[in-house]
């Protein structure tokens, strides 16, 4: 059996700098240390764990990656693949697939695991839905994933912009299946407004990531709430029983097997159909450190556990990400044609 790679020292969390940070400027990105410096928690320097043999990324040759990047820039589009430093970017781009990130590239949250920039976002780009639809049609995509930064500055959390993008894609590419990976729409009345708006043009798959176990939320997802995310998933499913719901969990942040299993049970109890489970990789030294590399055998055990709970599809493996091979995941759950 593969031996786990883990820290021999406990994670130490220190409170953020008490000095008031400089005011945010609209559209200016706070990344890496600048972003985490504004977070409620920061992390004491610790030795970096050596990546085990099963954490490897193939970088394919050819011009496909650069060609796709050029097309995205031409249409002023952003992918979460680039902004979040996804390890699978070269594989996905080389196959002509991408997860589009709408509503800008500046997030109002400061999650300690995420490499997307923090700051004060610009207003939504009214031309973005049309540009996205053109790109999807040009690429001939049969399955597309659309996600966004958190937009706590918007009354609907960006739900109307999601609907505008869905409608535009369906107009130009009626046979394309659409998965949306949404923020939590947290805030007074925001979830209600968002769900009412999404009902106007719902996706083929509704995805919202739970990310981690509840005990780790204060350090991993400051500004988010575990039960709120579960409720969002359940309420969408209640409104749209025939639409698949999906969520994702990262491993390696300090959780235990028992905690992960409990989270899987919570997701099923809240009517989530599909689940992705993958290894967290630290994007910069300023972010939450990797506490442990889970083994392939453990991912297999979680896949079997999830199947036993009744998920329609479980994708569990070190390099699995929420939208990695999303078309295959959906096909396995009976969504994509």
From Swiss-Prot:
Q: Where do the Radical SAM core domain residues begin and end?
A: 93-312
The answer to whether UniProt assigns keyword Zinc to this entry is: no
* A Pfam family that the UniProt record links to this protein: Radical_SAM
Name the reaction it catalyses. Answer: [[Fe-S] cluster scaffold protein carrying a second [4Fe-4S](2+) cluster] + N(6)-octanoyl-L-lysyl-[protein] + 2 oxidized [2Fe-2S]-[ferredoxin] + 2 S-adenosyl-L-methionine + 4 H(+) = [[Fe-S] cluster scaffold protein] + N(6)-[(R)-dihydrolipoyl]-L-lysyl-[protein] + 4 Fe(3+) + 2 hydrogen sulfide + 2 5'-deoxyadenosine + 2 L-methionine + 2 reduced [2Fe-2S]-[ferredoxin]
Q: Where does [4Fe-4S] cluster 2 bind?
A: 107, 111, 114
Provide the primary localization: cytoplasm
* Keywords, ordered alphabetically: 4Fe-4S, Cytoplasm, Iron, Iron-sulfur, Metal-binding, S-adenosyl-L-methionine, Transferase
Give the residues the record marks as binding [4Fe-4S] cluster 1: 81, 86, 92, 323
The terms describing its cellular component in GO are: cytoplasm
Q: Which InterPro entries match?
A: Aldolase_TIM, Elp3/MiaA/NifB-like_rSAM, LIAS_N, Lipoyl_synth, rSAM
Q: What is its EC number?
A: 2.8.1.8
Q: Give the cofactors, semicolon-separated.
A: [4Fe-4S] cluster
Q: Which GO terms describe its molecular function?
A: 4 iron, 4 sulfur cluster binding; lipoate synthase activity; metal ion binding
Known pathway: Protein modification; protein lipoylation via endogenous pathway; protein N(6)-(lipoyl)lysine from octanoyl-[acyl-carrier-protein]: step 2/2
Cell compartment(s), UniProt = Cytoplasm
Q: How is the cofactor bound?
A: Binds 2 [4Fe-4S] clusters per subunit. One cluster is coordinated with 3 cysteines and an exchangeable S-adenosyl-L-methionine.
| Top-rank lineage group of the source organism | Bacteria
Family (UniProt)? Belongs to the radical SAM superfamily. Lipoyl synthase family.
Protein's UniProt name? Lipoyl synthase
Species whose genome carries this gene: Xanthomonas oryzae pv. oryzae (strain KACC10331 / KXO85)
């Amino acid at each position: 059996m593969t031996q786990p790679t883990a820290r021999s020292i406990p994670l130490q969390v220190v409170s953020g700098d008490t000095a008031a940070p400089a005011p945010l400027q609209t559209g200016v990105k706070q990344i890496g240390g600048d972003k985490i410096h504004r977070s409620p928690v920061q992390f004491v320097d610790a030795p970096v764990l050596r990546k085990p043999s099963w954490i490897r990324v193939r970088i394919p040759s050819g011009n496909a990656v650069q060609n796709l990047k050029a097309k995205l820039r031409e249409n002023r589009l952003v992918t979460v693949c680039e902004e979040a430093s996804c390890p699978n970017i070269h594989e996905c781009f080389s196959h002509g697939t991408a997860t589009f990130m709408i509503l800008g590239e500046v997030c109002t949250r400061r999650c300690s695991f995420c490499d997307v920039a923090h700051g004060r976002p610009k207003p939504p780009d009214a031309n973005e839905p049309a540009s996205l639809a053109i790109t999807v049609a040009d690429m001939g995509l049969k399955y597309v994933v659309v996600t966004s930064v958190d937009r706590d500055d918007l009354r609907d959390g960006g739900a109307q912009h999601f609907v505008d993008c869905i409608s535009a894609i369906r107009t130009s590419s009626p046979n394309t299946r659409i998965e949306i990976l949404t923020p939590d729409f947290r805030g007074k009345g925001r979830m209600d407004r968002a769900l009412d708006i999404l009902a106007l043009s719902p996706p083929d798959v509704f995805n919202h990531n739970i990310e981690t176990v509840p005990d780790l939320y204060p350090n991993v997802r400051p500004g988010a709430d575990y039960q709120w995310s579960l409720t969002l998933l359940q309420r969408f499913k209640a409104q749209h029983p025939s639409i698949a719901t999906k969520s994702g969990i990262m491993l390696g942040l300090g959780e235990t097997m028992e905690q992960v299993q409990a989270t899987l049970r919570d997701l099923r109890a809240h009517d989530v159909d599909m689940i992705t489970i993958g290894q967290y990789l630290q994007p910069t030294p300023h972010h939450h450190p990797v506490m442990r590399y889970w083994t392939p055998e453990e991912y297999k055990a979680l896949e079997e556990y999830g199947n036993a709970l009744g998920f329609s599809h479980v994708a569990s493996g070190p390099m699995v990400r929420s939208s990695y091979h999303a078309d295959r995941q959906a096909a396995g759950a009976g969504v994509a044609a």
